[in-house]
Amino acid sequence: THFSGCKGKIRSVNGLYEGMMDDAINVHGTYLKIVERIDDCTVRARYMHGQAWGFDWGYIGDRVQFVRSRTMELVGNPFVTEIKEVVECLDEHKDSASPLYGVSHVAKEFIIRFGDVLPPEVSGYEGYVVENLT
């Protein structure tokens, strides 16, 4: 059972978890890879895992942090002032087991503007991701 990008409290009471193969409950956020620094306050960021597409990643006012992939170093702590989905057309998913079954359009990328000037090293060239802390 995975919970991703949730806010508030998650309670599991008297649950029976069998045949899960790994963690019975996995609570986590979803990173977006920085693929382009558009200007000092704006980036283009992308889901890199096919099972993550389609999640609402963030909202205006959310607080984020940047993470250098190679070292897990944390950089910056700005808040989102604008977020725009970059929607792609897909071949409609035919597999009824897929969470995207029947979906023909999905947001894989976002243009995200922040309330602060970004650290200079945050770009599409330095291997950074953005994590929503809210």
Give the predicted meaning of each segment.
Residues 1-134:
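Extracellular/periplasmic carbohydrate-active domains that bind, remodel
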